[in-house]
Amino acid sequence: MKFLLNKIFNILLISKIGLLLTCILLFSSCNLYYNLFYTDPTKCFDNAKCHKPYDAIIVPGFPHDSGKVNIVLSQRIKWAYYLYKNGYAKNIIFSGAAVHSPYIESKIMRLLAIEIGIDDSHIYTETKAEHTTENLYYSYLLAKELGFQSIAFATEPAQSSFMKPFKRKFKLKFDFLPIVTDSIIKLNIKFNPIDESSTFVSNFIPLKERESITKSLRGTRGRKVKKEIHASKLLKRKQNHIAK
């Protein structure tokens, strides 16, 4: 009887140890995933306090419908305003072409930003990007061309988290500054009507009619940008070889 009880006890002990190890592994995996792929707004903002002011922040565009400022566009512009007015950013780069509507996203954002009080001399626009990876990469190149050294990517946590592996893979030097919702809720900002005519593309064809779903998904995942990065690296190698 004593032998049987000891055996049962050992089995239960092993089961508990196994369960504990499983929980530890799951927790470690979740923590690893969190650190690798999620841009925590609070942590990123605390980091920004140590590195501000950034020479420039990159703010990706979003489709605009005439006469309306949708919630996503509103949040991104308000966040840019908050960072600019509170000394976190010296300059702002708005990025985006006319992608899903006939209005050039970056130019619409610029007009709205000026309307709420951001100095136009500190606003730049990147007008080629049609996907998030392009928003980031093309604006990053523009920032470097303008001589900006410290750069941050300012958007929703979900979108910035999507860009975390991209940054790591191509060793781009910038910080993430995802929106801290509590900060923009407190802002008393109302968007007044703007003259949108300068941002309108008359012969506009939406992206969904220019690209298949497969091609569009590849663009979202950065296929076009990856090709451009590899081509740029190859060109530099050739130039260095010729110089030698």
Give, region by region, the residue ranges found by the protein language model.
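Short intrinsically disordered, low-complexity coil segments enriched in acidic
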Residues: 2-3, 26
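N-terminal Sec-pathway targeting helices
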Residues: 3-19
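Low-complexity, Gly/Ser/Thr/Pro-rich intrinsically disordered linker/tail segments
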Residues: 213-244
